[in-house]
């Protein structure tokens, strides 16, 4: 299984070698807030990805400076006009858990798989609405049934005095 994943990664890299844009970023944050939830202390959050004809593939991570809370996200996005489609794999590990990235057992994995869609009204009025739903991985109710957790976001970008 691991060999297949490595082979797929190599093939994807070769396919995107002619990418229009490769990006590498790193943020240092005093606290990690995700979708309004406190998800960690001071962290470094690097990312690596590439854009090609509306398709974006990237890896993003977060690791705390003091604790052993880590996150590795793999994401795929496709943008066409004002519509964006998302597929995300979030992997989290806490200090109490061993690092088992390749554990995909539905009730013990650190992975959460999510799909979503976002739509922006127009460039002149860039109000966006997005919806994401978890469909696999670590997302269960107390009774053991899949939770199908969903998140909706309404956003409008703005600046304050050219900041």
Regions found by a protein language model. Name each.
Residues 135-137, 144-149, 155-159:
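Histidine/lysine/aspartate-rich catalytic loop segments that bind and position anionic ligands
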Residues 20-65:
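Short glycine/proline- and aromatic-enriched beta-strand/turn motifs that initiate or cap beta-hairpins
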Residues 26-28, 46-52, 74-78, 115-119, ...:
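Residues on the lipid-exposed face of transmembrane beta-strands in outer-membrane beta-barrel proteins
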Residues 20, 40-44, 68-72, 79, ...:
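Residues that define the transmembrane beta-barrel architecture of outer-membrane proteins
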Residues 8, 13-15, 37, 65, ...:
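Residues embedded in well-ordered secondary-structure elements
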Residues 1-21:
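Cleavable N-terminal export/targeting peptides
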Residues 31, 61-71, 81-116, 120-143, ...:
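Outer-membrane beta-barrel translocator/channel fold
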Residues 19-21, 54, 122-127, 158-163:
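Short loop/turn motifs that connect adjacent beta-strands in outer-membrane beta-barrel proteins
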